């Protein structure tokens, strides 16, 4: 529920910011407009150590910002990704419960401020983008897991938020979800293709994201497909 609320809050902030920028425009919506917006669907490719626990992810990205010049812009973005754990990340818990029905998933939310440098032609363009912000990651199990004794502490147990001591998982822990929030940064590049007036452009982007979440940091590369205005 908390993750759903944050997704809704992030989307609302993007809409409000975009509306404020829109109402403040003194220019027509041509190639020289001061407003920039984007909406897209990212497909996530995790990078180690995240790749050890997650196969892939998919989500939603929306942003709005201010064009300082034709090449330089500020972009505020909200990103949400649903992360799907690998079998190896959940197998130790299934073995401990003697249940193959146990499932899990993760949510990653990010609020970032970014600088974009763009080289735009009449039809094609390319850009570099990077910045920083706040990242929130949560992982949830389909049922509570109660730890017993003498369970070897592996990174998979730590990923789900369990505490270890002297090389074993501490006994009598009951856990169904855990979360971590941390600052982070991102950097990447993309390509644009003009598809309509006044300046709609499809964009394809790859951007590396890092956040110092615990117990394992978050590293991933969303491959994003969307439209910029």
Task: Give the ranges of each region predicted by the language model.
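Bacterial N-terminal signal peptides that target proteins for export
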Residues: 1-9
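Outer-membrane beta-barrel biogenesis signature
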Residues: 14-38
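Gram-negative (and chloroplast) outer-membrane scaffold detector with strong preference
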Residues: 25-27, 41-43, 58, 63-151, ...
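Residues that define the transmembrane beta-barrel architecture of outer-membrane proteins
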Residues: 33, 54-58, 105-111, 124, ...
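Residue-level detector of the transmembrane beta-barrel scaffold of outer-membrane proteins
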Residues: 36-38, 73-75, 127-129, 201-205, ...
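Flexible, solvent-exposed coil segments and beta strand-coil junctions
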Residues: 38-44, 88-97, 163-172, 200-206
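Extracellular loop and loop/strand-boundary signature of outer-membrane beta-barrel proteins
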Residues: 46-50, 96-103, 171-177, 209-213
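Predominantly the C-terminal beta-signal and adjacent terminal strand-loop region
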Residues: 83-85, 177, 190-229
């Amino acid at each position: 529920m908390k993750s759903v609320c944050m997704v809704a809050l992030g989307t609302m902030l993007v809409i409000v910011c975009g509306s404020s920028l829109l109402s403040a425009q003194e220019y027509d919506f041509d190639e020289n407009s001061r407003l920039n917006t984007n909406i897209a669907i990212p497909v996530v490719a995790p990078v180690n150590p995240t790749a050890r626990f997650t196969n892939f992810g998919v989500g939603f990205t929306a942003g709005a910002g201010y064009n300082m010049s034709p090449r330089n812009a500020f972009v505020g973005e909200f990103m949400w990704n649903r992360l799907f754990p690998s079998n190896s990340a959940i197998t130790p818990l299934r073995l401990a419960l003697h249940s193959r029905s146990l499932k899990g998933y993760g949510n990653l939310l990010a609020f970032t401020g970014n600088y974009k440098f763009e080289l735009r032609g009449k039809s094609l363009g390319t850009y570099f983008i990077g910045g920083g912000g706040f990242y929130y990651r949560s992982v949830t199990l389909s049922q509570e897991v109660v730890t017993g004794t003498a369970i070897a502490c592996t990174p998979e147990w730590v990923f789900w938020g369990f505490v270890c001591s002297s090389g074993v998982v501490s006994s009598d822990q009951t856990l169904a979800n855990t979360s971590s929030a941390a600052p982070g940064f991102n950097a990447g590049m993309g390509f644009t293709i003009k598809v309509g007036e006044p300046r709609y452009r499809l964009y394809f982007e790859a951007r590396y994201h890092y956040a110092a979440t615990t117990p394992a940091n978050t590293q991933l590369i969303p491959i994003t497909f969307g439209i910029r205005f």
